[in-house]
Amino acid sequence: MHGNGGQPAAGGSESALSREGQPGPSGAAQGQVISNERSPRRYSTRTINGVQATNKFTAVGNPSLQRDPDWYRWNYNHSIAVWLRECSRSHAKICNCGQFRKHWFQECAGLEDRSTQASLEEAILRPLRVQGKRAKRKLDYHYSQPTPNRKKVYKTVRWQDELADREADFTPSEEDGGTTSSDFDGDINFDIGGDSGIVDELLGRPFTTPAPVRIV
């Protein structure tokens, strides 16, 4: 800061960017004219070599940008202005309400209740889940392949384990007579000879006296 006669204020130091002739946000380079205009909307406007630059968008909530030499470049505002213009044009094609900014606030946009959007969310998220499952299958395949330090990992068949668990949990009841398959002898001969008559009956041949099943 400067006091009377252009001298630095007592007890302070003068920054290089604030000296006249040095380019930067706090001073003007030679041949440049800077005009500060305070807007009623609390953002400043500067004109440098006929180019108007403001901090309307970049300075909101971030005063530290004022210390950046590139803070007054018009690219910031130009990019945001182009984006807002595209938002307005896209909104005009799909909606008839007055302003597209209403869609930024749920209480003003008249959005549907989330319960009615469940099917829409499912339609959006389903491709992501399918792609995730597909990627997992690919990873499982590569994981099962042998490596120099690991043997091949075989897929576990779960239905065999579940069947063994059900058999282990089985307990005989009174309806079963309190017996299990292990209570029966394993020496029953189920061999049915050709002369037993049962085969003839199944084939529609004349019925003959069936021979009894032999139990050894």
Curated annotation (Swiss-Prot):
The protein's Enzyme Commission number: 3.1.3.16, 3.1.3.48
Region feature Disordered, mapped onto this chain: 1-50, 165-187
Biased composition (Low complexity): 21-32, 178-187
EC main group: hydrolase
Keyword GTP-binding: no
Transmembrane portions of the chain: none
Keywords associated with the record: Early protein, Hydrolase, Protein phosphatase
One MF term in the entry's GO annotations: protein tyrosine phosphatase activity
Reaction equations catalysed: O-phospho-L-tyrosyl-[protein] + H2O = L-tyrosyl-[protein] + phosphate; O-phospho-L-seryl-[protein] + H2O = L-seryl-[protein] + phosphate; O-phospho-L-threonyl-[protein] + H2O = L-threonyl-[protein] + phosphate
InterPro entries assigned to the protein according to its UniProt record, in alphabetical order: HEV_TT_vir_Orf2/Gyrovir_Vp2_N (IPR004118)
Stimuli inducing this protein: VP1 and VP2 are detected 12 hours post infection, while VP3 only after 24 hours.
Catalytic residues identified in the record: C95
Keyword match tRNA processing: no
Source domain of life: Viruses
Its job: May act as a scaffold protein in virion assembly. May also play a role in intracellular signaling during viral replication.
Family statement: Belongs to the gyrovirus protein VP2 family.
Designated name of the protein: Dual specificity protein phosphatase VP2
Organism of origin: Chicken anemia virus (isolate USA 26p4)
Gene coding for it: VP2
